[in-house]
């Protein structure tokens, strides 16, 4: 990625972590369809590899704004995709995708972080990976920790995530009939791939 700063990438990861961690409330639903978000999406589209994924997300948001009981419908989509059994879902855990659930714990320790008691999900939840990546990108911008150390940890985190994120995104596309979370997971997949390529 060339046009986005480390802080902007950190913000994208933090935003995605929030959206994948819990159902959207009314305020978040209003925010994602706001003019401010449209400006943010325009900035993201300035990064060519992200353009198609952001367009897909914007289309799903436009459809969402005319959907009756949008918040309730999205809540049902969230529960069906992320909280049910894995037979027709896209469970957001490394362990559900046959990956080492301890890897994220090791990465968090290496980064000097731990999971919050307010987040009642296992440590291998997708949102934890995204929060870690957000933290690492913010740290790159601060310059207090050697960039080489942060970059090494970022690469380890991206490598671990890339082992199961494509399957997760494919399951979102397969089982999210409305398409909001499918579009969100596609944006995440492209972002992670771009971030990984930026060694």
Curated annotation (Swiss-Prot):
Coarse class of the protein's main subcellular location: cytoplasm
Protein name: Chaperone protein TorD
Family from the record: Belongs to the TorD/DmsD family. TorD subfamily.
UniProt GO BP: protein complex oligomerization; protein folding
Any single Gene Ontology cellular-component annotation: cytoplasm
PANTHER family, A to Z: CHAPERONE PROTEIN TORD, CHAPERONE PROTEIN YCDY
Entry keyword annotation includes Chaperone: yes
Subcellular location: Cytoplasm
Source species: Escherichia coli O127:H6 (strain E2348/69 / EPEC)
Keyword terms: Chaperone, Cytoplasm
Role, per record: Involved in the biogenesis of TorA. Acts on TorA before the insertion of the molybdenum cofactor and, as a result, probably favors a conformation of the apoenzyme that is competent for acquiring the cofactor.
């Amino acid at each position: 990625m060339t046009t986005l700063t480390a802080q902007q990438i950190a913000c994208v990861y933090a935003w995605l972590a929030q959206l994948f961690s819990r159902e959207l409330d009314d305020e978040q639903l209003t925010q994602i369809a706001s003019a401010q978000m449209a400006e943010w999406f325009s900035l993201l589209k300035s990064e060519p590899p992200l353009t198609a994924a952001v367009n897909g997300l914007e289309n799903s948001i436009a459809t969402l704004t005319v959907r009756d009981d949008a918040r309730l419908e999205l809540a049902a989509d969230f529960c069906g995709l992320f909280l049910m059994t894995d037979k027709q879902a896209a469970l957001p855990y490394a362990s559900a995708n046959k990956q080492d659930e301890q890897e994220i714990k090791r990465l968090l320790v290496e980064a000097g972080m731990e999971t919050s008691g307010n987040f009642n999900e296992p440590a291998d939840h997708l949102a934890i990976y995204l929060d870690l990546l957000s933290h690492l990108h913010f740290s790159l911008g601060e310059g207090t920790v050697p960039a080489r150390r942060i970059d090494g940890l970022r690469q380890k985190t991206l490598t671990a995530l890339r082992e199961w994120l494509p399957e997760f995104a494919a399951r979102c596309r397969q089982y999210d009939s409305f398409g909001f979370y499918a579009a969100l997971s596609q944006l995440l997949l492209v972002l992670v791939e771009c971030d990984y390529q930026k060694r």
